[in-house]
Structure formats: C-alpha cells, structure tokens
C-alpha cells in the first residue's frame, strides 16, 4: 500500500541585484508499506543576464525526515557565435525518495516481489550531484545540434539483481554508490511547424558493475502534426550491452550474464 500527498508553492519577483528571482517550496507526505516519510524542499533561484552570457544560480534546502542537505545550482550559457554557437556549464543536484511504484516500474521482468525481501523495509533516497559541459548551435534552416559531457555522483542508485539460495530464486532491487561519465549528442530538425525529427545518442561509463543498465542508447524520433485532431509519432531505439547479475545467499557476486543488445 502506498499513498502520496504533495503541496507546492511558487513566488516570483524582480530585484535590482538578483534580477528575476523565483522561490519554490514543495512539501510531500509519503506512506509506503508501513513507513511514513516527510520531505520538504525549498529553493531560491535567480537569473541574471550579462553582455554575452546568461547565468542562473540557486540554493536549495532539502529536508527528508530529520536529514538536511544544502544543494547549490549554477547554470551559465555563453554566446560564442552570434545566433549560431553557444557553450554551457551546469552544476547541480537533487535528492529523490524512492517509492514502491519506482520499484515495480523499474523491475525489468515486472515480477511480483515483497519489499521486505530487500535489505530494509525502509525506502532509501538517492542524492545526485552532477556537472556538465556542453555546446549547442544551429547548422542550417531548422536544424540544430548539441553535444555534452557530464560527470555524475549518486549515493543510492537502484538496479535489479537476481538472488538465489538452495531453495528459491528471486529478483530484488539493490542500491549502490555510483559515479558515472556520460557523453551525449543530439540533432534536431524541424523544417516546418508540422514535421519534427530528432536523433540522440548517449554513452555512459560506470565505476560499478550494474544489472540491466545499458551503457549506450541511440534513438530516432519523429512527429507529424496533421491537424488539431490527428498527429503521428514514432521512434526507433537501440540499447547497448547489458548484464544480468546474480548474487548468492550471502549477497556475494555469483555470476554476470551478458544480454543481447
């Protein structure tokens, strides 16, 4: 059983030094299985324009139960070529509390499992920090591109592993501290208001062995807007190699089976 109640507020204004500012608050109450969680997030964000750059700065206070975290955020975009090429830098993070819904949806086999089969009945949270460098620009009429490299650190990344003992086999979520490096490239083409295509590619490197998590993903997406009532959309995706991990009854690594892309 799971219930979630959330209230959000937002205030905006102008200031001589802060320019445009936004103050957001989110309060949520989550009941999952037999546990209750209270999560409050508050963020003050400011935008400022310079000659060739746009900057966005924020500071968030995240309170989960009695644990408090301060999460800074910085985003800067600088114009290299007028209306043609931009560089960007991002630094930020967030904390998310897992839900039972997350556990079921992320299960690669969607098989039934009991939350008590995990290491603890209490759901963990995942705190993520990242930094990203990127370039984006325009090629020719209606076609734009972007490339970026990002480094990410997470304290409780969730993936699914197989467990076994002398009597039974089952699947359950595992949580691990994870550092990763991601390369991203994208191409966007919108020649008319009705036809839109975009291509994206992502490649990731992890410092841990993960189960059912691909290291590469390619995608081609299309959208055609016929009129106010009808539209067509479609996609082609390729997922890179993955491994299915199996742990023994003492939670030691037993084997890893390579899956077909």
Role assignments for model-derived ranges:
Residues 1-51:
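Outer-membrane beta-barrel transmembrane domain signature of Gram-negative proteins
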Residues 3-7, 36-40, 68-72, 125-131, ...:
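Residues that define the transmembrane beta-barrel architecture of outer-membrane proteins
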Residues 7-13, 27, 42-48, 61, ...:
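Residues on the lipid-exposed face of transmembrane beta-strands in outer-membrane beta-barrel proteins
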Residues 13, 27-33, 48-52, 59-65, ...:
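Transmembrane beta-strands of outer-membrane beta-barrel pores
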Residues 14-23, 50-57, 82-87, 141-147, ...:
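Repeated loop/turn-to-beta-strand initiation elements of outer-membrane beta-barrel proteins
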Residues 64-68, 72, 77-148:
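Flexible, glycine-rich linker and terminal segments associated
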Residues 101-123, 154-178, 204-219, 238-261:
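Outer-membrane beta-barrel domain signature, especially the mid-to-C-terminal portions
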Residues 122-124, 130-136, 146-198:
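Outer membrane beta-barrel strand-and-loop segments of large Gram-negative receptors
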